[in-house]
């Protein structure tokens, strides 16, 4: 299970119980905090809307910008340097929102994939409020497919933590 909240935790559950197998401090709190610092917006609904109109290639160097050929099975439009174009371009707020969400989503994705692989599982359940960012969900879906992992975004998953405490 990948719990995407303010940060992100990866938990392995089976008949014997639950164990924390990984995580990162990046999550929805990072998205809101960085967007507030970069362009003075911390409303998740507005950030989500902005990101869907943004172009991450305006802030990130992608693989085709920095290498001449393929790297494994990664798509050539994968980010190679998050915010690497920040020194040369002037992105708009939508591009910045897309860049922030992309960076957080990629970190969550890699953490989830490595946690799953190291635990020998191929099924991932995603809970939490952070997947409400549509761009983040799209990035996670693409990555899980690339690694042939089965995944499910739980409907009402933003309430899963609350239900688990009852």
Where are these regions (language model features)?
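Short beta-strand scaffold segments in enzyme catalytic cores
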Residues: 7-13
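Glycine- and other small-residue-rich loops at beta-strand/loop junctions that grip anionic moieties
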Residues: 23, 97, 101, 129, ...
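Generic secondary-structure signature for well-ordered alpha-helical cores
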Residues: 36-43, 52, 56, 88, ...
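Glycine-rich phosphate-binding/hydrolytic loop that grips phosphoryl groups
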Residues: 31-36, 43, 106, 149-166
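Short glycine-aspartate micro-motif
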Residues: 1-3, 23
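Glycine-rich phosphate-binding loops at beta-strand->alpha-helix junctions
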Residues: 114-117, 121-143, 157-158
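Adenine-nucleotide phosphate-binding core of ATP-dependent small-molecule kinases
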Residues: 72-123
């Amino acid at each position: 299970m990948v719990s995407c909240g303010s940060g992100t935790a990866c938990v392995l559950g089976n008949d014997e119980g639950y164990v924390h197998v990984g995580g990162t401090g990046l999550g929805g709190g990072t998205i809101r905090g960085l967007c507030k610092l970069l362009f003075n917006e911390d409303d998740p609904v507005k950030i989500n809307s902005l990101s869907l109109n943004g172009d991450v290639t305006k802030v990130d160097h992608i693989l085709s910008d920095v290498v001449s050929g393929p790297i494994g099975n990664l798509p050539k439009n994968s980010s190679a340097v998050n915010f690497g174009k920040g020194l040369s371009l002037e992105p708009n707020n939508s591009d910045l929102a897309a860049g922030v969400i992309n960076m957080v989503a990629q970190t969550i994705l890699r953490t989830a994939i490595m946690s799953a692989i190291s635990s020998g599982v191929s099924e991932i359940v995603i809970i939490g409020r952070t997947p409400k960012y549509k761009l983040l969900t799209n990035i996670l879906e693409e990555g899980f497919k690339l690694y042939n992992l089965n995944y499910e975004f739980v409907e009402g998953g933003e309430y899963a933590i609350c239900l688990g405490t009852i």
